[in-house]
């Protein structure tokens, strides 16, 4: 881990003077749960049909055919890395999902004051510490007709040095999917989530609408998504995304563009870009987001398989 990686990651999400350790105790739970979502500005409440949808709205996995697998990896800020994986299985009206996300800050040697210099310099002990945040979640969804209702139970654990904090929380969500034409989704995330010492998982309400303008099983693809996000003690955010491409014979390319009216509490660009390669039931995704004062950008890659 590069020096100050933990602090930089926190500042990138939360404003200075009010870091996550004070009120909102998680970086990981505010990041997009899938590469497709990341490319569409972080929208996800009404993106249905993939296993990774459970990280934004548990009801989003209700429309999978039988099975869905998804995984992603992103070298994040200051040498840290974000990864996610999810699985969803549908049996009749019920869909069950399980997923995990991690934010790995790498490892750093333990440094203590050097008595030979009167404590003015440090010395390594030969040991190292490995800060991280990890989230495990499971979802259960019931669908009847066009409507679905789902719940998620999640466990978040964070460790920095010898300090460990953890919390249990839950999400609830609903979705209405009208064939492949449109989907409406609403979710409330991180109910509960007390990490102790006044730190809480960020409570967030999301409402979204996704529209398909073409048959998603046909040659041409065109989709838009619009989502409002309301996070506790933060300004509201409106996310807009568009996805389009050409797929023929089960093989094709898609491009994605997202825009989020984020409040000035993060150094991330308001614009996100991405794309993907479609190979039958397998999709390979990519997402890009620039960062200003921190320099550089993030690149996220992912795989989705829906047999």
What do the predicted segments below correspond to?
Residues 22-307:
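Subset of outer-membrane beta-barrel
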Residues 5-15:
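Bacterial N-terminal signal peptides
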Residues 17-21:
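Sec/Tat signal peptide C-region and signal peptidase I cleavage site
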